[in-house]
A protein has these predicted regions:
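Local sequence-structure signature of Cys/Sec-based thiol-disulfide redox active-site neighborhoods
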Residues: 1-37
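General "foldedness" signal
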Residues: 17-19, 40, 52, 68, ...
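Generic alpha-helical propensity signal that fires on short helical segments
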Residues: 21-23, 53-56, 77
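Generic hydrophobic, helix-prone segments enriched in Leu/Val/Ile
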Residues: 34-35, 52, 84
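Thioredoxin-like thiol-disulfide oxidoreductase module
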Residues: 39-61, 88-90
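Non-catalytic, surface beta->alpha helical segment in thiol-disulfide oxidoreductase systems
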Residues: 67-90
Length: 90
């Protein structure tokens, strides 16, 4: 299983408030160790890796998580607690 976290970078270069909050929760819980990749969706760069992933998965908010397992469709989560409940604590 591969887990990717996509964080938003605002036009002024700062991280979005919700992204900061989610990162804090991931670090506090220890779940950050299970995140394989963290990419940025930069509002100033539509070709940034996170913006490309957002388009590919039809997501219009951040942060979001993409969970990939071989032979299965990707699962996308835009709600932190749903991600934790379904992927971190099954």
């Amino acid at each position: 299983m591969k887990i990717t976290l996509v964080k938003k970078v605002l036009a002024d270069g700062s991280s979005c408030r919700k992204c900061i909050d989610v990162m804090g929760k991931l670090e506090q819980s220890g779940y950050i160790e299970r995140i394989d990749e963290i990419v940025s969706a930069d509002e100033k760069d539509p070709d940034s890796p996170g913006m490309k992933l957002a388009r590919e998965h039809n997501v219009d908010r951040a942060p979001f998580f993409i969970v990939q397992e071989a032979g299965q469709p990707s699962r996308v989560y835009t709600v932190y607690y749903q991600f934790v409940r379904e992927e971190m604590e099954p």
